[in-house]
Amino acid sequence: MSFLKNIFPTPKNSNSQTQEIIVDMHSHLLFALDDGASTLEDSLSLLEEFQALGYKKLITTPHIMGDFFKNTPETIFPKLELLKKVLKEKNIALELEAAAEYYLDEWFIEKLNRNEKLLTFGNNYVLFELSYINSSVYIDEAIFMLKSQGYNPVLAHPERYIFWHGNTQALQEIYNKGVILQVNINSLVGYYNKGAQKMAEQLIDLGIVKMLGSDCHGIRHIDALKKARKTKHYKKALPNLINNTLLS
């Protein structure tokens, strides 16, 4: 499908396809915005951990969820600029950007209906998530509207949605519609549950995982991340990933 080539860019050289991930595109590192880092000190500690793991760029994605996390550019970007300033003062060589992780519900559909500008990263990518328990009645509508408005949708952690466990065909169909599937690295060590681990491995085996993300909320996720980056399926996923094309 030729249209997928525009969404899933080929890495600039063959080496970049198989090297370690140096760009993370899903995390909750901006303090006091959601259920991630609580303080500036927490944010800095996590950034230092990522640097020690060899990351060069972090695209952090605070939750935007109508009933719980009502973040906006006005709440997100001042925290981003403050953190970038502190990184510079401390000579921490990390590139830091911010987008968002949108929760797919009626509130999000209303944003799309208003043609409200969404927070994006890279090639106009929009990260969105679903309920872990129940499939969303809005998913086909959201995909259509996002693409119609020029966005490239990225589905966060599809392996964690229990209603899809054992049904890789459903996710293959979503992928075929031009949706990027982003698996959480920590799923590869069963951090969330064994069902999520199995699904993550199956999606990687199918070759339809284009992004791996840390989904880091705190130091507990860093500890699991260190183990997950040594797994067979982490290494198997690397050649198909586009994470490192996000390095500016």
Spans of model-derived segments:
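An N-terminally biased module of ancient metal coordination in phosphate/nucleic-acid-related enzymes
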Residues: 1-92
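Extended substrate/RNA-proximal surfaces in nucleic-acid metabolism proteins
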Residues: 2, 70-177
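Mid-to-C-terminal alpha-helical segments outside catalytic/metal-binding sites
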Residues: 3-4, 10, 226-248
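Hydrophobic faces of well-ordered beta-strands that scaffold small-molecule active sites
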Residues: 23-27, 58-60, 96-100, 126-128, ...
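Active-site environment of divalent metal-dependent phosphoester hydrolases
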Residues: 65-68, 103-105, 160-164, 188-191, ...
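His/Asp/Glu-enriched short active-site or ligand-binding loop at hydrolase and phosphoryl-transfer sites
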Residues: 178-190
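Short acidic/histidine-rich active-site segments
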Residues: 208-224
